[in-house]
A protein has these predicted regions:
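Flavin (FAD/FMN)-binding glycine-rich loop and adjacent Rossmann-like elements that form
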Residues: 2-3, 7, 11-23, 27-227
């Protein structure tokens, strides 16, 4: 009604319904409600978004041994496995300890379409392709870890993320914008709705860029969430 969203239409097992609300919060992750309501947005950087991922966990791991290898050693093993016929598109991988004994979380995949282009999370077909390719890639990295990385010899695939991990899609144009410089400078806000110490990540064609704050954090201003 005018510039105010009064509710949303949904489809479920009982058919089509209207859910009315005093306030509507878009928690879709892709700005679906905002865009359908006409809010301005951008899509990635110059139309290019980051690669998706699919995280999984392995158990029965010798965690101390498995996590003792540095990045260069892991990348060398990936190169060796590729020469042997493995399909391992991501070289810079992260193996992280879990609170559970003998378990490691594996953030190692890079999910693309068959032509190498990133997954467009606003398209149902792309999401389906990503789910299929992601789960196949999980199995390939599982096979690689068991064969090449000491500590994983007896490991088993424990579980896989329930859905594709999307790093980037639409960005709604808010009343304010959280910028890279805000993160670099660890800027605080009088209207913060959250604080974060998580790094800037960029997973694209040029490789992986990550920037970590040193014992500091930045705020996410309320205004960045208002279209």
């Amino acid at each position: 009604e005018g510039r105010t969203v009064q509710g949303v239409l949904v489809e479920n097992k009982n058919g089509r319904h209207a859910i009315m609300a005093k306030r509507v919060v878009d928690a879709t992750g892709d700005g679906d409600v905002c865009v359908w309501a006409g809010a301005p947005f951008s899509f990635g950087k110059n139309g290019a978004v980051q690669y998706a991922t699919m995280v999984f966990r392995m158990n029965h791991v010798d965690v101390a041994k498995a996590l003792s290898h540095d990045r260069h050693r892991l990348e060398a093993w990936i190169d060796e496995a590729e020469r042997a016929g493995y399909d391992l598109p991501r070289k810079h991988i992260y193996l992280l300890p879990s609170p559970r004994p003998g378990e490691v979380m594996c953030n190692v995949t890079r999910i693309t379409k068959a032509n190498g282009e990133p997954i467009d999370a606003t398209k149902a077909e792309d999401l389906t392709i990503g789910e299929q390719r992601g789960r196949k890639q999980v199995r390939e990295y599982e096979r690689f870890l068991r064969r090449y990385v000491p500590g994983f010899e007896s490991a088993m695939l424990n579980d896989v993320a329930p859905q594709l991990g999307i790093r980037q899609s639409r960005t709604i144009a808010g009343e304010a914008t959280l910028t890279n410089d805000d993160v670099f400078q660890a800027r605080k806000s009088a209207h913060a709705v959250a604080s974060s110490a998580w790094c800037i990540e960029a997973h694209g064609r040029d490789g992986i860029f990550m920037f970590y704050l040193d014992n500091d954090y930045y705020d996410i201003p309320y205004e960045t969430l208002i279209p």
